[in-house]
Amino acid sequence: MKISSFISTSLPLPTSVSGSSSVGEMSGRSVSQQTSDQYANNLAGRTESPQGSSLASRIIERLSSVAHSVIGFIQRMFSEGSHKPVVTPAPTPAQMPSPTSFSDSIKQLAAETLPKYMQQLNSLDAEMLQKNHDQFATGSGPLRGSITQCQGLMQFCGGELQAEASAILNTPVCGIPFSQWGTIGGAASAYVASGVDLTQAANEIKGLAQQMQKLLSLM
């Protein structure tokens, strides 16, 4: 076919035009075309629910149900608590030790510790007294320990036991009450530092240690 004869062939034109659409024929078939305004109106008329609206509704319903449950629980809790009487436990009275039990404890402690102190004092001599007086008269030394036990018996026990403990504490050792030999920095320390008649002092202390044996027999 020549190009000139192809160009001269005319395509069929639309046979009718009506309002919103145009109708024509192409290759023996009818073709219609809607206008853009009508297409827009058709889209606007469609009703579709937005995606996710049903899920959001379920979540809101669930949260509302939980909130109502929590509120109901709190109301019941306060309602029940308001009807229950408040019970305050009665204070437990402090158990004070009786004088008898305290006295027995003092006796027991003296019975356990005095024998050890008595044994150490029975071996005392002038040299040991001068060299170790500070150690013997502090802490758990035999002078401090034995005097402390005698003071406990004198203060918290009665009868013959109290009288015997008091006699031991007030017995002079080289003119100084035995109770002062269990401390340092006083008259006993000054006497030991002088070095005078330490043998006599040691012997008198040993005599008091033997006298403590009577305390043990009275317990």
Swiss-Prot record:
<feature type="site" description="Arginine finger; crucial for GTP hydrolysis by stabilizing the transition state">
    <location>
        <position position="144"/>
    </location>
</feature>
<dbReference type="InterPro" id="IPR015110">
    <property type="entry name" value="YopE_N_dom"/>
</dbReference>
<keyword id="KW-0614">Plasmid</keyword>
<dbReference type="GO" id="GO:0005096">
    <property type="term" value="F:GTPase activator activity"/>
</dbReference>
<keyword id="KW-0843">Virulence</keyword>
<comment type="function">
    <text>Essential virulence determinant; cytotoxic effector, involved in resistance to phagocytosis.</text>
</comment>
<dbReference type="InterPro" id="IPR037168">
    <property type="entry name" value="YopE_GAP_dom_sf"/>
</dbReference>
<dbReference type="GO" id="GO:0050765">
    <property type="term" value="P:negative regulation of phagocytosis"/>
</dbReference>
<dbReference type="Pfam" id="PF03545">
    <property type="entry name" value="YopE"/>
</dbReference>
<comment type="similarity">
    <text>Belongs to the YopE family.</text>
</comment>
<dbReference type="Pfam" id="PF09020">
    <property type="entry name" value="YopE_N"/>
</dbReference>
<dbReference type="GO" id="GO:0141030">
    <property type="term" value="P:symbiont-mediated perturbation of host actin cytoskeleton via filamentous actin depolymerization"/>
</dbReference>
<dbReference type="InterPro" id="IPR003537">
    <property type="entry name" value="YopE-like"/>
</dbReference>
<feature type="domain" description="Bacterial Rho-GAP">
    <location>
        <begin position="101"/>
        <end position="219"/>
    </location>
</feature>
<keyword id="KW-0998">Cell outer membrane</keyword>
<feature type="compositionally biased region" description="Low complexity">
    <location>
        <begin position="8"/>
        <end position="32"/>
    </location>
</feature>
<protein>
    <recommendedName>
        <fullName>Outer membrane virulence protein YopE</fullName>
    </recommendedName>
</protein>
<feature type="region of interest" description="Disordered">
    <location>
        <begin position="1"/>
        <end position="37"/>
    </location>
</feature>
<keyword id="KW-0472">Membrane</keyword>
<dbReference type="InterPro" id="IPR014773">
    <property type="entry name" value="YopE_GAP_dom"/>
</dbReference>
<keyword id="KW-0343">GTPase activation</keyword>
<dbReference type="GO" id="GO:0009279">
    <property type="term" value="C:cell outer membrane"/>
</dbReference>
